[in-house]
Amino acid sequence: MLTVYTQSDQALSWIERHGHCPPVFVCVLGFTETGLIPGISAAGKTPADRKLTAIADAEFLIKGTTAGATYPLPPLISGVSPVFITKALVDALHTPVYLFNSGLPIPPAVPVINLDGQPARCLSTGQALPLALVEHLFQQGLQWGAQLAQEHAESYLVLSECVVGGTTTALGVLLGLGIDAGGKVNSSHPHCNHQQKLALVRQSLEHHSPHLNAMEVVAAVGDPMQMVVAGMAIAASHSTGVMLAGGTQMLAVYALIQALTRQQNLAVDFSRLVVGTTKWVCEDASGDTVGLANLLAPVSLLAPQLSFSSSVYPQLQVYEQGFVKEGVGAGAMAIAAHLYKNWGQEQLLELIENLITRELGQVKEKKQQ
């Protein structure tokens, strides 16, 4: 049910140490105007939809229904939001949920912890965020990471994100840090739009020195989520386990952690950090997530072998065709459910389908064998 794609010894050690513990779910919400570029993301049909994706996902994660929602889940190009996966599993596990607003255009209609950030400008400007704000968000991450680890000493932290356009800002950060990530990132499209992403990133980085430090890279081409999660992971690793919940975006955060600890002489326990995502990310032939993880060695990359091929819902089946793939910590929560409760394919799929049945009002019919 669980595949370790890189650094298996480190991953197995992490699982032995933390896998039996209940998870605590953290989602850092953010926004970048990069997500408004036509064709950049499939996480919302139109730019107007994509502006509300994180806000709607947050509301659904807490309320569990779009009935009467202030911000209903926007239509996707195909499929349903990965928040359905996450919501089904955090509810079934009774997992504590913390939502952080690192920089949204409007506040969600549910309680969130406001970090006094702001949305990022499009990375094509080369001036995505003020440097002082990047430093502030990093300090907020350090403080909250330490606090959450202390408050949940018998758990581990699942640190997730919701940032539309975030794989493009992730590519920007990776290239800005000198990591040869071109052609290796993923997207919510079935076939990754590498050329579009690379052109945007190169346009922005050509205005800068090739020797930017980690903070300066995020200020140039990043998004507000990245420094918050990096800070949280660094601080929490001193006392508990951390699963960075996502593919490309969390590998970029891992690269930031490596750079920050090197440049600022910060202590971090890398043995307590793993990256958890979905098989749809790891096995996406139009990217190379495993190759990217190997560039950042020694990072452990894990994914559940959750499959939607037998689902009665076409909205889930399209995940097997490469749509959506990941988001809002979906892969990591499936890993957590498997490790903590030993739930396998059948239990996980049933929980997710039951939520869709309740939400979409569709009667679930078993497929004919």
From Swiss-Prot:
| GO MF annotation list | nicotinate-nucleotide-dimethylbenzimidazole phosphoribosyltransferase activity
Q: Which domain of life is it from?
A: Bacteria
Question: Family, per the entry?
Answer: Belongs to the UPF0284 family.
Specify the protein name. Answer: UPF0284 protein sll1500
